[in-house]
């Protein structure tokens, strides 16, 4: 069963991957992996992916999608971040797609030396918390607002229907490109 939360839009995913600047041989964490879309997209560019979600149905769906895509370097971890990362090699890059424990997750990633993290926010409160946490830790790099509008036919012509905006907060020790 597909997770109830929305999947990362392709256009947003393209920007996320560019901002992450994934490295061959690295470890990438997808926290709040949902459908697994970001994990699957990142898998060809890194040695190992941690696909993390607290919802068993999301892990099951993401595992199924990864299998269909032939992504074999994804390790699925059911549980809460940041605790689920304890005792594992630290990820060099991370995408945070869920807002639960956002400040603790950002702080834990920063403490383990994650070089770059991208937080996806649809709620303004999550945006504010992510930015303020990164600023407090001295790792804030930039924020982006991405809004995609898709064309639709209307009365023999074309109109654009805007989607909801997505905020990306980028942080870490590595400078942004």
Which residues does each PLM region occupy?
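Conserved SAM-binding loop of SAM-dependent methyltransferases across substrates and taxa
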Residues: 35-46
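Conserved SAM-binding motif I beta-strand of class I
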Residues: 48-53
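Class I SAM-dependent transferase core
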Residues: 1-24, 29, 61-64
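Conserved S-adenosyl-L-methionine
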Residues: 32
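A short, conserved alpha-helix within the catalytic core of class I
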Residues: 101-109
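S-adenosyl-L-methionine
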Residues: 54-89, 93
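C-terminal substrate-binding/active-site "lid" region of AdoMet-derived donor-dependent transferases
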Residues: 110, 114-163
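Core SAM-dependent methyltransferase catalytic element
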Residues: 157-177
């Amino acid at each position: 069963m597909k997770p109830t939360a929305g999947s990362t839009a392709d256009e947003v995913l393209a920007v996320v991957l560019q901002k992450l600047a994934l490295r061959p041989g690295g470890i990438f964490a997808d926290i709040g992996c949902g459908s697994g879309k970001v994990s699957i997209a990142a898998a060809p560019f890194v040695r190992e992916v941690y696909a993390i979600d607290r919802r068993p149905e999301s892990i099951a769906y993401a595992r199924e999608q990864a299998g269909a895509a032939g992504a074999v370097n994804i390790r699925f971890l059911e549980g809460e971040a940041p605790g689920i990362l304890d005792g594992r090699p630290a990820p060099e890059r991370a995408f945070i797609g869920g807002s639960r424990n956002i400040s603790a997750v950002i702080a834990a990633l920063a403490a383990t030396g994650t070089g770059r993290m991208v937080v996806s926010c649809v709620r303004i409160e999550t945006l504010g918390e992510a930015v303020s946490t990164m600023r407090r830790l001295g790792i804030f790099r930039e924020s982006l607002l991405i809004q995609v509008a898709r064309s639709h036919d209307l009365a023999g012509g074309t109109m654009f229907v805007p989607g909801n905006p997505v905020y990306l907060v980028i942080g870490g020790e590595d400078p942004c490109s």
